[in-house]
Amino acid sequence: MIDEAIRSISKKYTIGGHISVAGGLHNGPARAAVFGFPTFQFFSKNQMRWSSPPLKDDEAAAFKSEVRKYGIESTMIHASYLINLASADPDLYKRSMEAFHDEIDRSDKLGSTFLTVHPGSNPDRADGIRRVRDALSTIGDHAVIILIENTAGQGNVIGTRLDEVAKIIDTSDKKLGVCIDTCHAWASGYDLRDSLEKFIESLDYTIGLDRIFAFHLNDAKREMGSRIDRHELIGKGTIDGGLINLIRDDRLRAKPKIMETPFGEARFEDNLRYMSSKIGE
């Protein structure tokens, strides 16, 4: 059993993690509650397959019941890694759109607060941004808040720079926002370690803090600007203390911060203990 003092860090700073739903979606909330998480992320289906069995009504009802039972304040579904809304390939774009719409439907059926999706890749960055914007314009009415995640800069991915992310969500749709991955931001050249305030100001200026709904809280294995997406345990990587300052920032405290660190649930307690030791609680 994890000490209540450690669990309290999760609640005070709105920290969660990516949780396995092996054995059924309804298992997620109980696993999140072990760490005192007020929020958590999960896959609603196999993230490496295009198709999946339809979500049954009783599965959705059981999940929502467990969310209420454990007092989970918000949930986040991570969309399939196969989706590429920026693709210029007609077949891939069509499959991506179908999968994206399915993710939205599943999110609404499960009552998920957020759905986070990677924008995708395209060697023509302007065309890629346009295609993602077009994709977002087709989704119609939905309850879930859709979040575009910034990327680390590998290959031809779109959304590496904050101004690209801002262009993608340049709309008045209040159910469209951004999830900032700290490892990705660091890998793409933003200094979260020694210039966090400058980074937060950049977020506010280019996107708006009101459009930043959540963070993926990850340290990084590689140096700033590496353009390599390799997550590390909190405090064991190259961002180090910058993440503690981000967690403690009053402007960001209430925003969900989801850990996607190596070994998942097996090391979440280590992450929380490190945070507690550095925060002094």
Swiss-Prot record:
The keyword Metal-binding applies. Its EC number is 3.1.21.2. Binds 3 Zn(2+) ions. It holds the Pfam family AP_endonuc_2. SUPFAM superfamilies: Xylose isomerase-like. The keyword Metal-binding applies. One of its GO terms (biological process) is base-excision repair. Zn(2+) 3 binds at H184, D229, H231. Its cofactor is Zn(2+). GO terms for molecular function: deoxyribonuclease IV (phage-T4-induced) activity; DNA binding; DNA-(apurinic or apyrimidinic site) endonuclease activity; phosphoric diester hydrolase activity; zinc ion binding. It catalyses: Endonucleolytic cleavage to 5'-phosphooligonucleotide end-products. InterPro entries: AP_endonuc_2, AP_endonuc_F2_Zn_BS, Xyl_isomerase-like_sf, Xyl_isomerase-like_TIM-brl. It comes from the Archaea. Keywords: DNA damage, DNA repair, Endonuclease, Hydrolase, Metal-binding, Nuclease, Zinc. Belongs to the AP endonuclease 2 family. This is Probable endonuclease 4. It comes from Thermoplasma acidophilum (strain ATCC 25905 / DSM 1728 / JCM 9062 / NBRC 15155 / AMRC-C165). The lineage of its organism: Archaea, Methanobacteriati, Thermoplasmatota, Thermoplasmata, Thermoplasmatales.
